[in-house]
């Protein structure tokens, strides 16, 4: 993927940044694509860096992701909760699966979606092969992950646990408006100036 470069004029002349580094200067982190360990490490490093720079200012986490590895996503979520800076989450395009958990784990009152965003909640996916005991261990781990994800959704949305268990039984796609009604986000962001 070609990463755009931004040229800025400074007192010392021109300075070139890749677009992501330039956005980071404005405390904006882009989470796009599949969530995995490599992406998680990058997002965590950016969160820690911005928090160390100034923990009184918000960090904006823009999310456009189909989801991914649960442990990688939970590592990002734990870091969002660990740092002192408020983390504003904004869904752009798609916040599916683990990405929807990150979206709803933003600072209360600062969780947004753009009008045409889609949010997907569902139970964890997984697979196993090997001996029966190995398959049983993997199945138990998926059940533990499902319980943990449902508890997070319960805490962040205020929805009853029984409703969340039912709603995540299968893929549950929500529009931005439906995500707001469900409690996954706080507001639909029509334009940046209004929020």
UniProtKB/Swiss-Prot annotation:
Keyword Mitochondrion set for record: no
* Coarse class of the protein's main subcellular location: cytoplasm
Judged by the first EC level, this protein's enzyme class is hydrolase
Biological process (GO) annotations held by this record are: protein quality control for misfolded or incompletely synthesized proteins
Give the keywords, sorted.
Cytoplasm, Hydrolase, Protease, Serine protease
Entry annotation: catalytic residues: 97, 122
Leader sequence range is: none
S-S bonds: none
Its cellular-component GO annotations read: cytoplasm; endopeptidase Clp complex
Q: Which domain of life is it from?
A: Bacteria
Which EC number(s) are documented for this chain? 3.4.21.92
- Mind telling me which SUPFAM superfamilies this protein's record contains? ClpP/crotonase
GO MF terms on file? ATP-dependent peptidase activity; ATPase binding; serine-type endopeptidase activity
Which reaction(s) are listed as its catalytic activity?
Hydrolysis of proteins to small peptides in the presence of ATP and magnesium. alpha-casein is the usual test substrate. In the absence of ATP, only oligopeptides shorter than five residues are hydrolyzed (such as succinyl-Leu-Tyr-|-NHMec, and Leu-Tyr-Leu-|-Tyr-Trp, in which cleavage of the -Tyr-|-Leu- and -Tyr-|-Trp bonds also occurs)
Q: Where in the cell is it found?
A: Cytoplasm
Main role?
Cleaves peptides in various proteins in a process that requires ATP hydrolysis. Has a chymotrypsin-like activity. Plays a major role in the degradation of misfolded proteins.
Q: How does it assemble?
A: Fourteen ClpP subunits assemble into 2 heptameric rings which stack back to back to give a disk-like structure with a central cavity, resembling the structure of eukaryotic proteasomes.
**Which family does the entry's similarity section mention?**
Belongs to the peptidase S14 family.
- Supply the name of the protein: ATP-dependent Clp protease proteolytic subunit
Q: Which organism is it from?
A: Lactobacillus acidophilus (strain ATCC 700396 / NCK56 / N2 / NCFM)
Q: What gene name does this entry carry?
A: clpP
């Amino acid at each position: 993927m070609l990463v755009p470069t931004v040229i800025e004029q400074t007192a010392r002349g021109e300075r070139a940044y890749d677009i992501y580094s330039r956005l980071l200067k404005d405390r904006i982190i882009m989470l796009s694509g599949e969530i995995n360990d490599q992406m998680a490490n990058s997002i965590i490093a950016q969160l820690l860096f911005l928090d160390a720079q100034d923990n009184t200012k918000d960090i904006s986490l823009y999310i456009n992701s189909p989801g991914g590895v649960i442990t990688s996503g939970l590592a990002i979520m734990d870091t969002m909760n660990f740092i002192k800076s408020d983390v504003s989450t904004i869904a752009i395009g798609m916040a599916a699966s683990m990405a929807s958990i990150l979206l709803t784990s933003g600072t209360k009152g600062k969780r947004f979606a753009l009008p045409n965003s889609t949010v997907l909640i569902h139970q964890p996916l997984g697979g196993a092969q090997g001996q029966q005991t190995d398959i049983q261990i993997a199945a138990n781990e998926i059940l533990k992950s499902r319980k943990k994800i449902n508890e997070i959704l319960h805490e962040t949305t205020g929805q009853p646990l029984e409703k969340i268990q039912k709603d995540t039984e299968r893929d549950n796609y929500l529009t931005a408006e439906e995500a707001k009604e469900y409690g996954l986000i706080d507001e639909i962001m029509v334009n940046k100036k209004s929020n």
